[in-house]
Amino acid sequence: MPENVAPRSGATAGAAGGRGKGAYQDRDKPAQIRFSNISAAKAVADAIRTSLGPKGMDKMIQDGKGDVTITNDGATILKQMQVLHPAARMLVELSKAQDIEAGDGTTSVVIIAGSLLDSCTKLLQKGIHPTIISESFQKALEKGIEILTDMSRPVELSDRETLLNSATTSLNSKVASQYSSLLSPMSVNAVMKVIDPATATSVDLRDIKIVKKLGGTIDDCELVEGLVLTQKVSNSGITRVEKAKIGLIQFCLSAPKTDMDNQIVVSDYAQMDRVLREERAYILNLVKQIKKTGCNVLLIQKSILRDALSDLALHFLNKMKIMVIKDIEREDIEFICKTIGTKPVAHIDQFTADMLGSAELAEEVNLNGSGKLLKITGCASPGKTVTIVVRGSNKLVIEEAERSIHDALCVIRCLVKKRALIAGGGAPEIELALRLTEYSRTLSGMESYCVRAFADAMEVIPSTLAENAGLNPISTVTELRNRHAQGEKTAGINVRKGGISNILEELVVQPLLVSVSALTLATETVRSILKIDDVVNTR
C-alpha cells in the first residue's frame, strides 16, 4: 500500500532563491498529492474486491496477538487492516459508515468508491478541474437515486416471503450460506418479535441479543423468546424453577469489609468465635431479607473488588431453595431488566417484592456434553426482546455466523426503515450506467463528460461479480448492457447458474436503502478525496 506522502514545501525552496523570487513554485504538487491519495484509496478497494458476492473469496486476518479471523464481510476486513495512508483510512471509515447506516453492502460501497476514483484519475489527466468533476458527480448521484427509486418496488412487512428472500440474499455471500434456510427465518422472526410492524420506522438491534456458545454446529442455532445466560448456576442442586421470581443485585453476598485498610487483632478463641458468629449472622440476615420478598432466582452482578458470593451465603441460599447465577456482566444488565422486568438493586434495604421480575420457567439446559445454558422463558413483562443462541464447532465459525446473522438482521431493519426492494445481482448498477449515460447526453460541456465517467464506473459491481464467479467479465457485462437496453430492467448475473437471468425470479433481492446508501456514501467520500490538494504533517 502506498506510504504517507511527505509534502515537499515549494514555498521554502522558492524563498531560498532570493527575496525577489519568494513565489510558490511547486505547481505540480496539488496534482501529485491528489494522485497519491487516489492510488492509496484504490489500493484498499482492490484489496477487498475479490470478496464480493456469493462466489467471493474469504480473507484470513491475523492480528498482533496471533488471533485469526476468517470473513468476507467488508467492514470486518477493513476494520482489522493496518492502513497508514490518511486517504486510504477514509475508505475504512466509509465502510464503517455503510455498516452503521445499512449494515450490508460494506464491500460494494468501497468497490464503487474505488471505481469512481479510477474515473477521477482519467478525468484529471485530461485536464478537467477537480471542482467540475465533484459537482458533476453530485448531479449524477441525485439522478442515480432517482433511477434507483424508480426501479424499486414497495414491500409490506406482512409479506414474509419477500423478507425471507432479502435475508437469504444477504446470507448467500457468507460462510454460513448453506444454513440460510435456518438463519433467514430466524432473523425475520427475531426482528418481527421486537417491533410493531404497523408503526415501526426502525429496529433497535440491542433488543436482539446474540449469545455465542461453543459446541454443536450452526444447525443447532435457535431463537429464544426470553433470556439466555451462559453463566452456570452456582448451586448445583437447583436447576429448574417454575413460576420464577427473579431478583438482580449489584452488591456482594459476603462478609463486609472496612472502607479503610484496618487491621483487627484477635487475641483469643472467644473473640475469633465471635467474629465468625457475627459474619454468619450478617450473611443469614441478608439471605432472609432476599427470601422474604418471594425471590427464588437470584442474579448477582460481577464484582471486581472481591468475591460477590461467599460459600456461606451460597450454603444459606441453597437451603432456602433459591437458584443463584453469579458473574452477570454489567453491559448485560439493561437487556436483562428489559426482558424480565426486574430492576437492579444496589443495597439490601431496597430489595423489595416490586423490584423482582417474573417468568414462567428458569431452567439450566444441558447441551449434549458441550456445556450448559440457563434459559428464562415465559416472561410476564411486555419488554420486546429476543435472544439468538449461536452454536458452532469452533470460535472462527461462531464469530462468522454471528456476523452473518447481524447482516441479515440489518437487511430486515433496512426494509423496516425504507419499505422498498430492488433486484440484486448487479442489475441496479447496470441500469444506473445505462440511464446515466442517456442523462449525460442531455448535459453540455465538461459536465456531460464527467457524468458519463460516473456512469461507466458503476459497471464495476457486475464486472466484479462475474469475475469472482469465474465468468468472463467483459462478455457478461456487454450482454447485460444489451439486455437492459432492450428494457429488461431486472436482468442480472445469476452466479449459481453462471449466466444472466431475470434476477427477481431467482429471488435475489436487496433493500433499496442498501443501494442508495452505498451510492451516496461512496460519492461523498470520492468528492472529499478529490478536493484535497495538500497533506500537511503537523508537529
From Swiss-Prot:
Major location category of this protein: cytoplasm
Catalytic activities: ATP + H2O = ADP + phosphate + H(+)
Matches recorded under Pfam families: Cpn60_TCP1 (PF00118)
Stretches the record annotates as Disordered: 1-29
Complexes and interactors: Component of the chaperonin-containing T-complex (TRiC), a hexadecamer composed of two identical back-to-back stacked rings enclosing a protein folding chamber. Each ring is made up of eight different subunits: TCP1/CCT1, CCT2, CCT3, CCT4, CCT5, CCT6A/CCT6, CCT7, CCT8. Interacts with PACRG. Interacts with DNAAF4. Interacts with DLEC1.
Gene Ontology biological process terms in this record: positive regulation of telomere maintenance via telomerase; protein stabilization
Entry function: Component of the chaperonin-containing T-complex (TRiC), a molecular chaperone complex that assists the folding of actin, tubulin and other proteins upon ATP hydrolysis. The TRiC complex mediates the folding of WRAP53/TCAB1, thereby regulating telomere maintenance. As part of the TRiC complex may play a role in the assembly of BBSome, a complex involved in ciliogenesis regulating transports vesicles to the cilia.
Record keywords, A-Z: Acetylation, ATP-binding, Cell projection, Chaperone, Cilium, Cytoplasm, Cytoskeleton, Hydrolase, Magnesium, Metal-binding, Methylation, Nucleotide-binding, Phosphoprotein
InterPro entries xrefs: Chap_CCT_delta, Chaperone_TCP-1, Chaperonin_TCP-1_CS, Cpn60/GroEL/TCP-1, GroEL-like_apical_dom_sf, GROEL-like_equatorial_sf, TCP-1-like_intermed_sf, TCP-1_chaperonin
Binding site for ADP: 53, 105-108, 172-174, 425, 510
EC number: 3.6.1.-
Residues noted as binding ATP in the record, renumbered to the chain: 53, 105-106, 174
Protein name as annotated: T-complex protein 1 subunit delta
Modified positions (N6-acetyllysine) in chain numbering: 21, 288, 302, 319, 326
PROSITE patterns: TCP1_1 (PS00750), TCP1_2 (PS00751), TCP1_3 (PS00995)
Organism domain of life: Eukaryota
